[in-house]
Amino acid sequence: MNSVIELLQTLIRIPSVNPDGDPGVSPEGEYAMAAFIGEFLEPLGFKITQEEPLPGRPNLIARAPGPENRQRILLGPHLDTVSIAGMSIEPFSAEIKDGKIWGRGSSDTKGPMAAMLWGLKENAANLANLPIAVDFVGFMGEESSQPGSQHFAQHHADEYEFAIAGEPTSLEAVYCTKGCLWATIEAQGRSTHASQPHLGDNAIMKLTEELNRLVNDFGGQLTKHSHQVLGTSTINIGKIKGGNRANIVPDKASAEIDIRTVPSFVENQSGID
């Protein structure tokens, strides 16, 4: 492998779509990514280990060569990508066209990952002598509920001074981000034939009423909390499920919501009704 471009193309050609909520996707993509990265970094002197927050889906941990008693920083991109559904190009071709590399994950985050890995390769002879150890971790599951980074933080957070995540940010340094909460709201009703809806209890209608209240009342409280860089806290209703047929009053309905919070919201959450 002769260049960072070739490295990025190789990474893109390893399909690693997050399998959560994407039926039919192979759950082995993150493992394949971890195996490749381990083979890339081990000859450079890195100590390679894997930890599995979920079965068969590892975090790849590479500790830099040199003294263990140094302060440590972390390069931490993620192994998985979002779905390829709806793409109009071959998702894993890594074709170079119009001065760009095309493919799923080319920017999020296999592009930054390739830059990090190539930087470690080019500086391999000096890594053991640096005053600070530069470790690399490839996180699994970032595009869903982030079990990889959560597991790593629980077991290793106190080992590091800071981390560079490598998300695509138009080459601007980003030092803060919104917090994230995913929640599911469920409504229970009573099923009956649609010709006599008064005999049932429509779960979708109950859910809709609750979602309206949530957006209007709780959403209004969220927007009171702002940050000079991040803007306001937000809420989004991202997915709704309910019912089986149009002529049946639904007895179950659910919605998945995404809440993004700024620091002042977390600091003052005791004041939220």
Task: Label the predicted regions.
Residues 80-82, 141-143, 190, 262-264:
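Short coil/turn motifs at secondary-structure junctions
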Residues 99-115, 193:
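Glycine/serine-rich anion-binding loops at beta->alpha junctions
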Residues 109-182:
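Acidic/histidine-rich catalytic neighborhood of metal-dependent amide-processing enzymes
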Residues 9, 38, 114-117, 121, ...:
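Predominant activation on well-ordered alpha-helical scaffold segments within soluble catalytic domains
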Residues 43, 49-54, 175, 182-273:
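Metal-dependent amide/peptide-bond hydrolase catalytic core
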Residues 72-74, 101, 161-165, 184:
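Short glycine-aspartate micro-motif
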Residues 83-97, 160, 175-186:
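Acidic-glycine-rich active-site phosphate/pyrophosphate-binding loop
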Residues 1-101, 106, 125-130:
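Acidic/His- and Gly-rich active-site-bordering loop/insert found
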